[in-house]
């Protein structure tokens, strides 16, 4: 349903943000 789609979208967005943040913190961008 719509809620599941939103949950998946939020998970993907959070994962991308976490990857970018960890990459900047480790200086490996």
Swiss-Prot record:
It comes from the Eukaryota. Expressed by the skin glands. One of its GO terms (cellular component) is extracellular region. Disulfide bonds join 23-29. It is found in: Secreted. Transmembrane segments: none annotated. Keywords: Amphibian defense peptide, Antibiotic, Antimicrobial, Disulfide bond, Secreted. Antimicrobial peptide. Belongs to the frog skin active peptide (FSAP) family. Brevinin subfamily. This is Brevinin-2Ra. It comes from Pelophylax ridibundus.
């Amino acid at each position: 349903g719509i809620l599941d789609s939103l949950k998946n979208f939020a998970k993907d967005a959070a994962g991308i943000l976490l990857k970018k943040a960890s990459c900047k913190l480790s200086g490996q961008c």
